[in-house]
Amino acid sequence: MPNFSGNWKMKSSENFEELLKALGVNMMLRKIAVAAA
């Protein structure tokens, strides 16, 4: 598996909440993450 560690800048947050949901992140953490993004 490639090493993806490092600094990343978010280019867009389109469907970000759906991605978090698919990854199994609970609703409260998703709302916080989307608000911060």
UniProtKB/Swiss-Prot annotation:
UniProt keyword terms in alphabetical order: Cytoplasm, Endoplasmic reticulum, Nucleus, Retinol-binding, Transport, Vitamin A
Instruction: Reply yes or no: does the keyword Phosphoprotein apply.
Output: no
GO molecular function per UniProt: retinal binding; retinol binding
Q: Which domain of life is it from?
A: Eukaryota
Q: Which GO terms describe its cellular component?
A: endoplasmic reticulum; nucleus
Q: Motif Nuclear localization signal, which positions?
A: 21-31
Localization annotation: Cytoplasm; Endoplasmic reticulum; Nucleus
Q: Which InterPro entries match?
A: Calycin (IPR012674), Fatty_acid-bd (IPR000463), ILBP (IPR031259)
| Tissue distribution of the protein | Embryo.
Instruction: Name the family the entry cites.
Output: Belongs to the calycin superfamily. Fatty-acid binding protein (FABP) family.
Role according to the record: Transports retinoic acid to the nucleus. Regulates the access of retinoic acid to the nuclear retinoic acid receptors.
What does the comment on domains in this protein's record state? Answer: Forms a beta-barrel structure that accommodates hydrophobic ligands in its interior.
Q: What is this protein called?
A: Cellular retinoic acid-binding protein 2
Q: What organism is listed for this UniProt entry?
A: Gallus gallus
Query: Its gene?
Result: CRABP2
